[in-house]
A protein has these predicted regions:
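Single conserved hydrophobic/aromatic residue that forms the stacking wall/gate
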Residues: 1-12
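N-terminal catalytic cores of NTP/NDP-binding nucleotidyl/phosphoryl-transfer enzymes
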Residues: 14-89, 94-96, 124-127, 134
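A short acidic, glycine-rich active-site loop
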Residues: 98-100
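A glycine-rich helix N-cap at a beta->alpha junction
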Residues: 106-118
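Metal-cofactor-binding active-site regions of metalloenzymes
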Residues: 116, 120-123, 127-128
């Protein structure tokens, strides 16, 4: 006979998740069942958290908690966007240094999420800690003609991505027509 904890574990491993691409519920099959890794976009820290920030934190935390009951090791990473036009605007408006603003609102965000009972991610990388990698990726995209520069911005060259918009179910040709 199978003990209860093992039976419960088998039930949990039959957990289904909604696949955005297929539109169907599918059984979760980790790439590596010995170490499940999850990455989720985190907040842009220029002001107090809003309900959308809290929703994502709660949903991601719930998923991580469920997975931790099923798998030996789960690592949850959620970034902190600490450089962005909104942050630059907040710095200009308040006269505060960008790092002061982002440190303050990162701490407030983490405190607010903890007050909601959300477990914080295992790792919270800051965007500014990865600027070199971003620049390298942008250069590569431009070299491969998958991105281009226009009016001080780097934009995706949508026709270079056959499946661009597939997850959002948006028509690629309409997105091309609306590009800059």
């Amino acid at each position: 006979t199978q003990d209860r904890s093992s039976a419960a574990s088998d039930v949990y491993k039959r957990q289904q998740l909604q696949n955005t691409l297929s539109g169907k519920k599918e059984f979760f099959k980790p790439v590596n069942p010995d170490h499940v890794r999850i990455y989720a976009c985190g907040p842009t820290v220029y002001n107090f958290a809003h309900i959308g920030n809290a929703r994502m934190a709660v949903v991601n935390d719930l998923l991580v908690r469920v997975l931790k009951t099923q798998y030996k090791k789960v690592t949850y990473v959620s970034n902190i966007t600490d450089i962005d036009d909104k942050i630059i605007d907040a710095s200009k408006e308040t006269g505060e240094d960008i790092s002061v603003i982002t440190s303050k609102y990162t701490e407030i965000y983490n405190n607010d999420m903890s007050a909601l009972g959300v477990n914080l991610p295992d790792i919270q990388p800051r965007a500014t800690d990865h600027i070199k990698e971003m620049i390298g990726l942008i250069k590569k995209l431009i070299e491969e003609e998958k991105a281009y520069e226009k009016e001080g911005h780097v934009l995706f060259h949508v026709p270079a991505f056959e499946n661009y918009g597939i997850l959002s179910k948006r028509n690629r040709d309409e997105q091309i027509a609306g590009s800059r």
